[in-house]
């Protein structure tokens, strides 16, 4: 069994991660650290887990008793923890924050997008789990980058559910504001652009195009629906072949002929991609569950790879489409 610890257990991604690990046949939750909830039952915070666990949050850090440490912390907190604590060499780390997503000589975290870096993930010790928008957008265009086809600007519009804003309420996540409403935020400047550009440059060394990304707040709870378009003169049959070839040996990303609906992926670790060609424009629709494929499901996928398991173990999940 893989003995797991979680630091930062009160948020939405932590709740989903706890649920996945409790039901994973090869994982055992050893502790869940939460400074704000120490001593409280997990079910006091994550009510959907009633009957699933008797665990309580702790302020202790028994790092010597685990094989894998997950960080579900606010951005910046993982880095602070690593600077002030010594994690045993034998303990692997998966960080769900953005602290180590940009690779560099100052750390050894591998960017944990399996559809891009599966081989490197299998041989890594520290994994930086990708962002939710970054995951959805990258999966839509990675095959183009591999075939050196990103030679003009990408135009992306992506709408996300309210859980993407985290568990702490704010003026823009309050129900009375978010319900029956829609708005954009951080146009052209979203923080996930850096990791997207890093990945595309990794596959296509000549890549220097701009990503014109408009993030949108949706009036639903979970999921990301992204539409991307780019200039492309190649016919749709060849484009589809390129995508199917790229994702042929990946377990969670699928190309669909039918125009898909977001509910087909909500509550799963899947990404659905639909391709359309209109004149010289290629339209790419990609969609994921922001808390699963965009966060905790992808973290468990990375755990499976780190420990030599079949990558779908613990991730056969039913969509909430009906």
From Swiss-Prot:
SMART domains per the UniProt record, alphabetical: Semialdhyde_dh
Catalytic site positions: 132
Key words, A-Z: Amino-acid biosynthesis, Arginine biosynthesis, Cytoplasm, NADP, Oxidoreductase
Known EC number: 1.2.1.38
Catalysed reaction equations from the record: N-acetyl-L-glutamate 5-semialdehyde + phosphate + NADP(+) = N-acetyl-L-glutamyl 5-phosphate + NADPH + H(+)
Pathway the protein acts in: Amino-acid biosynthesis; L-arginine biosynthesis; N(2)-acetyl-L-ornithine from L-glutamate: step 3/4
Cellular component terms per the entry's GO annotation: cytoplasm
Similarity comment text for this entry: Belongs to the NAGSA dehydrogenase family. Type 1 subfamily.
Function: Catalyzes the NADPH-dependent reduction of N-acetyl-5-glutamyl phosphate to yield N-acetyl-L-glutamate 5-semialdehyde.
Annotated protein name in UniProt: N-acetyl-gamma-glutamyl-phosphate reductase
